[in-house]
């Protein structure tokens, strides 16, 4: 068998009609049909794989929606749910309306907050009627010694008694050990001449009668409690002495209660 060369020259694979050897340029070489078909197959495959569409050729590749939105951005569209229309951002008709609504809402909100704050502050300050009831000025110049006057303060009666020297001596001579609610007379008065007490019985809230009872002070007709000239309980069911309110002397003959 004749021996065939394992690797033919590259010039033989191209074509016998285009290339020839240096020794014999006039006689073309023949090529095997099987080798020519293999060479053409690989050449066509290489050419078809190497040629691909490029972006600069005007072809748009198929991209995912998110990538396409990033590479091809467009203006955002705002959907109007009320009119079922689409308006681009910053539409003049919608911008003016939104500005009016926001400004009006802020004004109304500020007005409501102002009213609430004023109402809260005014509610904390006392009215004139309350201030008038909180304190009471009493002129003492018309009260005679040994007499009692009754004034109204915070809806309660207040007894003001101008005591005589005998009244003062009698109040100081009482044995504290015999008292149900022991209290010295000096602890209950700021000026020995004047006794100021709230005219409400400490038993059940009745109003005692002045210049009555067994001890020359007050007597409660409801349940028979007796108070002395210093307003201390001496007899009866009342557990405590008559209450002494807060008071002060503005002048010699002017008293401020409260």
Curated annotation (Swiss-Prot):
<feature type="transmembrane region" description="Helical">
    <location>
        <begin position="96"/>
        <end position="118"/>
    </location>
</feature>
<dbReference type="GO" id="GO:0045275">
    <property type="term" value="C:respiratory chain complex III"/>
</dbReference>
<feature type="domain" description="Rieske">
    <location>
        <begin position="161"/>
        <end position="256"/>
    </location>
</feature>
<feature type="binding site">
    <location>
        <position position="223"/>
    </location>
    <ligand>
        <name>[2Fe-2S] cluster</name>
    </ligand>
</feature>
<feature type="topological domain" description="Mitochondrial matrix">
    <location>
        <begin position="47"/>
        <end position="95"/>
    </location>
</feature>
<dbReference type="GO" id="GO:0009408">
    <property type="term" value="P:response to heat"/>
</dbReference>
<keyword id="KW-1278">Translocase</keyword>
<feature type="binding site">
    <location>
        <position position="201"/>
    </location>
    <ligand>
        <name>[2Fe-2S] cluster</name>
    </ligand>
</feature>
<keyword id="KW-1015">Disulfide bond</keyword>
<dbReference type="InterPro" id="IPR036922">
    <property type="entry name" value="Rieske_2Fe-2S_sf"/>
</dbReference>
<dbReference type="InterPro" id="IPR004192">
    <property type="entry name" value="Rieske_TM"/>
</dbReference>
<dbReference type="GO" id="GO:0016491">
    <property type="term" value="F:oxidoreductase activity"/>
</dbReference>
<dbReference type="InterPro" id="IPR006317">
    <property type="entry name" value="Ubiquinol_cyt_c_Rdtase_Fe-S-su"/>
</dbReference>
<feature type="transit peptide" description="Mitochondrion">
    <location>
        <begin position="1"/>
        <end position="46"/>
    </location>
</feature>
<feature type="topological domain" description="Mitochondrial intermembrane">
    <location>
        <begin position="119"/>
        <end position="258"/>
    </location>
</feature>
<protein>
    <recommendedName>
        <fullName>Cytochrome b-c1 complex subunit Rieske-1, mitochondrial</fullName>
        <ecNumber>7.1.1.8</ecNumber>
    </recommendedName>
</protein>
<keyword id="KW-0411">Iron-sulfur</keyword>
<feature type="disulfide bond">
    <location>
        <begin position="206"/>
        <end position="222"/>
    </location>
</feature>
<dbReference type="Pfam" id="PF00355">
    <property type="entry name" value="Rieske"/>
</dbReference>
<feature type="binding site">
    <location>
        <position position="220"/>
    </location>
    <ligand>
        <name>[2Fe-2S] cluster</name>
    </ligand>
</feature>
<dbReference type="GO" id="GO:0051537">
    <property type="term" value="F:2 iron, 2 sulfur cluster binding"/>
</dbReference>
<feature type="binding site">
    <location>
        <position position="203"/>
    </location>
    <ligand>
        <name>[2Fe-2S] cluster</name>
    </ligand>
</feature>
<dbReference type="Pfam" id="PF02921">
    <property type="entry name" value="UCR_TM"/>
</dbReference>
<keyword id="KW-0408">Iron</keyword>
<dbReference type="GO" id="GO:0009060">
    <property type="term" value="P:aerobic respiration"/>
</dbReference>
<keyword id="KW-0679">Respiratory chain</keyword>
<keyword id="KW-0813">Transport</keyword>
<keyword id="KW-0812">Transmembrane</keyword>
<dbReference type="InterPro" id="IPR017941">
    <property type="entry name" value="Rieske_2Fe-2S"/>
</dbReference>
<dbReference type="GO" id="GO:0005743">
    <property type="term" value="C:mitochondrial inner membrane"/>
</dbReference>
<keyword id="KW-0479">Metal-binding</keyword>
<keyword id="KW-0809">Transit peptide</keyword>
<dbReference type="GO" id="GO:0005739">
    <property type="term" value="C:mitochondrion"/>
</dbReference>
<dbReference type="GO" id="GO:0046872">
    <property type="term" value="F:metal ion binding"/>
</dbReference>
<comment type="subunit">
    <text>Component of the ubiquinol-cytochrome c oxidoreductase (cytochrome b-c1 complex, complex III, CIII), a multisubunit enzyme composed of 3 respiratory subunits cytochrome b, cytochrome c1 and Rieske protein, 2 core protein subunits, and several low-molecular weight protein subunits. The complex exists as an obligatory dimer and forms supercomplexes (SCs) in the inner mitochondrial membrane with cytochrome c oxidase (complex IV, CIV).</text>
</comment>
<dbReference type="GO" id="GO:0008121">
    <property type="term" value="F:ubiquinol-cytochrome-c reductase activity"/>
</dbReference>
<keyword id="KW-0999">Mitochondrion inner membrane</keyword>
<keyword id="KW-0472">Membrane</keyword>
<keyword id="KW-1133">Transmembrane helix</keyword>
<comment type="function">
    <text>Component of the ubiquinol-cytochrome c oxidoreductase, a multisubunit transmembrane complex that is part of the mitochondrial electron transport chain which drives oxidative phosphorylation.</text>
</comment>
<keyword id="KW-0496">Mitochondrion</keyword>
<comment type="similarity">
    <text>Belongs to the Rieske iron-sulfur protein family.</text>
</comment>
